[in-house]
Amino acid sequence: VKLTNASYFIQDEWKFAPKWTVTPGIRIDHHSSFGTHTSPSISLGYDVNAKTNVYAAYKEYFLAPTPYQLFDGFNGNRNLKPETGHEFDLGVHHKFGKTWNSNLSFFSRSTKDKIGWVMTNPAAFTGQYRNFDTEKAHGINADVRKQLTKHLSARLGYTYTHIDATPTRKANRDGYVPKHAVNAGLDYNDAKWDAHLDIRGIINRPGTADNVFPRKTYWLADISANYRVRENVTVFGRINNIFDTYYAEQSSVRWGNPGDWWPGQGRNFRLGLEVTI
């Protein structure tokens, strides 16, 4: 089976008044199996002052099933429909000073024929990709970044997500999408070195039943560094899950036995050399 998908996109930013900017756009997808789909978008921005900008944006989208979702011998479903939907965003960018930047936004999204995997035979642990009912979601994104020194910066972000339950799935896609997520970090950059501390917090991950996941709330920390020996030679190192936190992002407890999780990786290390030719 041969599938082709050609996409074309054009947008134009138009400053139609001293403080106002509008950016219309359009994307056209032509899929060999699902035809032609047109997805418009538009955003409107207003500069309140030199430090603050507010904006509103609307976009539509089309997402065809992947070849794996369609044709895999165990999970595939040739009757899948493409996902279509729209999203609305409303937000504000604000600079508290020369070294402080912040963003706050609200989003609302509606997806028709959302594609997801469904267990069809718990005894054999086999399933199939299917289209769900319309999926509606809304949430908040907030982040702030501070330049501490010439080379060192800090960042903090928070996301709240709520995905409505459907007749076949509970809220937040059976708990696989957390309600609250926190991201924080430190970044160091200079001519030779860059180093990063990344912290991720998953808070209140709901599930279809008790103990679907070993922890509903957990925190992970990673650290990495790169040293540029020459323009085309870099030595790198990384420690993932520094505190060896036990967690799982996939689970079969609903269909199997207590503790049937796919745990995430424990503490692990990477060290290497990258040469660009």
Q: How would you describe each model-predicted region?
A:
Residues 1-31, 39-41, 59, 151-158:
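Surface-exposed extracellular loop regions of Gram-negative outer-membrane beta-barrel proteins
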Residues 19-22, 51-54, 98-102, 151-154, ...:
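Repeated loop/turn-to-beta-strand initiation elements of outer-membrane beta-barrel proteins
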